[in-house]
Amino acid sequence: MRRYAALMVIDAVLLSTSQALSSSHASELRSQLSAADAMFPSAERDGGIPNKRSLRRISVTESNDGERDEERGFQISILTKLQKWATKMKLPKTTKNLQFRIWPKEKKDPKAVYAELKLAGLDPKAAKANPEFADYLAYSKIWNHRGGRYMTRS
């Protein structure tokens, strides 16, 4: 029983000293922050918007141009290089599969693919007779399965 009493006394001493140290450390941090706020008010730092978070110092904005969008998986440039390689190696099935991966990343809807495959100027019978029409139908099926019209640029 004496061991537990000794442990309780040691715990009480450690807790009281840690609280005393943390309160002095907190007041020191507050003085540093107030000096920083005097030099750089939060409204000036964040473009006129007061900021109460201290985790992020730079305001993040989304770009509409797509330059800074994070690409996950394969990037378009890698897929196009693979497609060119598959074309040179005469692998038509691989070329089509890679093309079906590139078009959604480029956010092309079936109308754009229809025009890209040069089916836009043809009458319906001639378009259906064209071997590229099967690719258009296959991509339309993939596009609709992935979300269709909700996937286009906003």
UniProtKB/Swiss-Prot annotation:
Secreted effector that is involved in host plant infection. Increases the susceptibility to P.infestans and reduces the plant growth. Affects the expression of host genes. PITG_15718-induced genes such as abscisic acid 8'-hydroxylase, a homolog of a salicylic acid-binding protein or a cysteine protease inhibitor gene, may negatively regulate the plant immunity or vegetative growth. Induction: Expression is up-regulated during the infection stage of P.infestans with an increase to over 1900-fold when the sporangium and zoospore attach to plant tissue. High expression levels are then maintained throughout the infection phase. Belongs to the RxLR effector family. Residues 42-70 are annotated as: Disordered. Residues 1-20 form the signal peptide. This is Secreted RxLR effector protein PITG_15718. A motif (RxLR-dEER) lies at residues 53-72. GO terms for cellular component: extracellular region; host cell. InterPro entries: RXLR. The RxLR-dEER motif acts to carry the protein into the host cell cytoplasm through binding to cell surface phosphatidylinositol-3-phosphate. It is found in: Secreted; Host cell. Pfam families: RXLR. Disulfide bonds: none annotated. Keywords: Secreted, Signal, Virulence. Its main location: secreted. It comes from the Eukaryota.
